[in-house]
From Swiss-Prot:
Extra information: Present with 556 molecules/cell in log phase SD medium.
Role according to the record: Component of the Mediator complex, a coactivator involved in the regulated transcription of nearly all RNA polymerase II-dependent genes. Mediator functions as a bridge to convey information from gene-specific regulatory proteins to the basal RNA polymerase II transcription machinery. The Mediator complex, having a compact conformation in its free form, is recruited to promoters by direct interactions with regulatory proteins and serves for the assembly of a functional preinitiation complex with RNA polymerase II and the general transcription factors.
Self-association and partners: Component of the Mediator complex, which is composed of at least 21 subunits that form three structurally distinct submodules. The Mediator head module contains MED6, MED8, MED11, SRB4/MED17, SRB5/MED18, ROX3/MED19, SRB2/MED20 and SRB6/MED22, the middle module contains MED1, MED4, NUT1/MED5, MED7, CSE2/MED9, NUT2/MED10, SRB7/MED21 and SOH1/MED31, and the tail module contains MED2, PGD1/MED3, RGR1/MED14, GAL11/MED15 and SIN4/MED16. The head and the middle modules interact directly with RNA polymerase II, whereas the elongated tail module interacts with gene-specific regulatory proteins.
Family: Belongs to the mediator complex subunit 3 family.
GO molecular function: RNA polymerase II core promoter sequence-specific DNA binding; RNA polymerase II-specific DNA-binding transcription factor binding; transcription coactivator activity
Species whose genome carries this gene: Saccharomyces cerevisiae (strain ATCC 204508 / S288c)
Primary location: nucleus
Protein name stated in the entry: Mediator of RNA polymerase II transcription subunit 3
Keyword annotations from UniProtKB, A to Z: Acetylation, Activator, Nucleus, Transcription, Transcription regulation
Sequence ranges of Basic residues compositional bias: 211-223
Gene Ontology biological process terms in this record: cellular response to heat; negative regulation of transcription by RNA polymerase II; positive regulation of transcription by RNA polymerase II; positive regulation of transcription elongation by RNA polymerase II; positive regulation of transcription initiation by RNA polymerase II; RNA polymerase II preinitiation complex assembly
Amino acid sequence: MDSIIPAGVKLDDLQVILAKNENETRDKVCKQINEARDEILPLRLQFNEFIQIMANIDQEGSKQADRMAKYLHIRDKILQLNDRFQTLSSHLEALQPLFSTVPEYLKTADNRDRSFQLLEPLSTYNKNGNAVCSTATVVSTNHSAAASTPTTTATPHANPITHAHSLSNPNSTATMQHNPLAGKRGPKSGSTMGTPTVHNSTAAAPIAAPKKPRKPRQTKKAKAQAQAQAQAQAQVYAQQSTVQTPITASMAAALPNPTPSMINSVSPTNVMGTPLTNMMSPMGNAYSMGAQNQGGQVSMSQFNGSGNGSNPNTNTNSNNTPLQSQLNLNNLTPANILNMSMNNDFQQQQQQQQQQQQPQPQYNMNMGMNNMNNGGKELDSLDLNNLELGGLNMDFL
């Protein structure tokens, strides 16, 4: 085979040699490949037979003669397997120059998606037990989706094994190195006896995976600061909740529960004179200012009629104080508006009763106010149930 295909031949030269077919070169190469292929099937059958014999080794007799016959039979099977392996190894060694052209063949445009990997670099040994090893190369190609060209790595054969009954496979020494107790263990039963341990003998240098960046450790000072911030936020939230809760409870306790009679007694004039409407509309401000001026005239007339500086309307002042305390623009509710309007109505009724009981010297000055009070009474007698409230803007109220 060396005369047909020299060692270190290139792919282009091999293609030229096979194309010319001088001295039947192509036929000889095909014959050598077929001979190596024909050795594979008998080797597999003989190896399966050996495994079956080793699996049934305990089922035969235990006499000395039976043991000797069993030993000789197993020895013959091992020697036959050894001869088969040596024959196949010789054929593969002869085809080694042809295998060396595989990496170049995979680099061509038509074969980039293919891969070839020689798992068992076999070689023969001489009668002294030393392996006769040629420069066999192991081809390993790894194809990736991103790479357009394959990556090939060629390394020389590993150190040969100097055991008489081994096939110079470097995997056996690797197995003994990784598992030093394998030779001390007893024989195993079942089909595991005689089964060789197949390892990937590719000598391609493994690519170390990049290490993940280590996360920065959080110092104790940073942890303490984070805990202090969390505690401060919790305290602020607790203080806000405690401040807002008593105000809401006191407001709810101070508000009276309106009854149907109280709601029916509310007049539109009293509602229009509330502080809320005075703030929102200029009409309400003018009305409230006129009411305040009239109230001042009434108080002056009462002061002149009584002849002393004492204020007879003590109930009015006492009623104005809770009204001002309950007035809070941030807590305006319909119940508060009704309560304020009812207090104003009650004060006007008390003022009218006191004016009727006491003499009024300034009749002309109070005539306008009496007319206004009489008009308020007429409006108070209106029935709100018969009013058209569909045109009112309830959102504004």
